[in-house]
Amino acid sequence: MAVGKNKGTSKGGKKGSKKKVVDPFTRKDWYDVKAPNMFSCRQVGKTLVNRTQGTRIASDGLKGRVFEVSLADLQNDTDAERSFRKFKLIAEDVHGRNVLCNFHGMDLTTDKLRSMVKKWQTLIECSVDVKTTDNYLLRVFCIGFTIKDQVSQRKTCYAQHSQIKAIRKNMTQIITNNVTSSDLKEVVNKLLPDSIAKDIEKACQGVYPLHDVYIRKVKVLKKPRFDLANLLELHGDGGGKGAEVSTGAAEGGVVVDRPEGYEPPVQESV
């Protein structure tokens, strides 16, 4: 055993025991998440990101984030028909403290899907890959269920295989016609009231009566090259700070968005 001083105990324990604990939230900033102007509620929420330090830029950490929001929140509506639809918004650019988002997909909640599946009926599904006029490649999923005819005395309402094929063909044709003739903004406007599903239900009445027909899911498979002008056009009609910036620029000056309690940095030389 070596005889000598224990340097660790003489200095008062382990190194770094009195290290100052820094709250990680002091290095972060809050940013407002903005939805495109297809929706009534433009202010979706807030998101955190580390402040810009050296080569790590805050806006790079925000781009590509996906936010999932209920349609009821986006439309400021308490209607039950809107609450089970979830829209995905992806952050594409950052302007000041605003994160500008674009449509990234749509889905139904799990509880809604599970509640529709019942006995004594036929479930009919289809999926189509379609391209919009502005070169977005979407995969659209549709779901529907057969319903018992009022005149029928049967307990069940199963469709024949030929009827299922005819219904699926109608679904594919209507989805293709609606999406290929529209750009992404028009497609989203059709998804809000689910007008495509209503057209399918009406068209299939002659084959076999359907109910609970919905566009179950929409995936964005491919996007065109990022265009800032198109994104700003999607966010152009909103009020608030965005409108202030545009009016200020029109008058010859620019309104700069600053956080609360902002103080300009001290200049070393003038």
UniProtKB/Swiss-Prot annotation:
Lineage: Eukaryota, Metazoa, Ecdysozoa, Arthropoda, Hexapoda
InterPro entries registered for this protein in UniProt: Ribosomal_eS1 (IPR001593), Ribosomal_eS1_CS (IPR018281), Ribosomal_eS1_euk (IPR027500)
GO molecular function terms noted in the UniProt entry: structural constituent of ribosome
Keywords assigned by UniProt, alphabetized: Cytoplasm, Ribonucleoprotein, Ribosomal protein
HAMAP family named in the record: Ribosomal_eS1_euk
Location of the region described as Disordered in the Swiss-Prot/TrEMBL record: 1-20, 238-270
Full protein name: Small ribosomal subunit protein eS1
Domain of life: Eukaryota
Family annotation (PROSITE patterns): RIBOSOMAL_S3AE
Subunit structure: Component of the small ribosomal subunit. Mature ribosomes consist of a small (40S) and a large (60S) subunit. The 40S subunit contains about 33 different proteins and 1 molecule of RNA (18S). The 60S subunit contains about 49 different proteins and 3 molecules of RNA (28S, 5.8S and 5S).
Coiled-coil stretches noted in the UniProt entry, renumbered to this chain: none
GO cellular component terms, semicolon-separated: cytosolic small ribosomal subunit
Subcellular compartments: Cytoplasm
Gene Ontology process terms (BP): translation
Family recorded in the similarity comment: Belongs to the eukaryotic ribosomal protein eS1 family.
Signal sequence, renumbered to the chain: none
Organism listed in the record: Culex quinquefasciatus (Southern house mosquito)
